Amino acid sequence: IRHIEEKDQQQLAHVIRSVFEEYGAPLVNTVYDDPRTEHIFDAMAGKNAGYLVVADDGGVQGGCGYYPTEGLPDGYAELVKFYLSPLVRGQGNGSVLFSQAIEGARRAGYSHLYIESFPQFSDAVAMYERHGFRHIPQRLGDSGHTATTIFMVKEL
């Protein structure tokens, strides 16, 4: 597990889109069709943000980060682009990425983390719940991913 590098962007975008296809999640108005998905390293630069990746001999196999999404309340960051290839699931990588992203947001001075998700990612939503994220009735901020239907927040 390491910080994202510019060279990781295309491979990471492929992993993210393949997870949407694998789970049958919506492909429109989501991370899937967002052109920024191919520029995660670029998006993080110069922001109070962070992104970690899981990498092996085959390259980048997933990642997770936090980002000050436009329109969020003061002190909030969004947990962003938390996706893993099936090749690295079930080995504790997701838990480590998730915990490190939460801790990174806390160290960066954020008071809350916000998440948007889908019912198709029920295992991830259950993990968020176990880690103290609570459901809220409506979206916060303007990620542009208007197809999301699950909104959660955690005080840090």
Per-segment meaning from a language model:
Residues 111-114, 118-156:
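C-terminal "cap" of GNAT-fold acetyltransferases
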Residues 3-87, 98-100, 104, 139-141, ...:
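Acetyl-CoA-dependent GNAT
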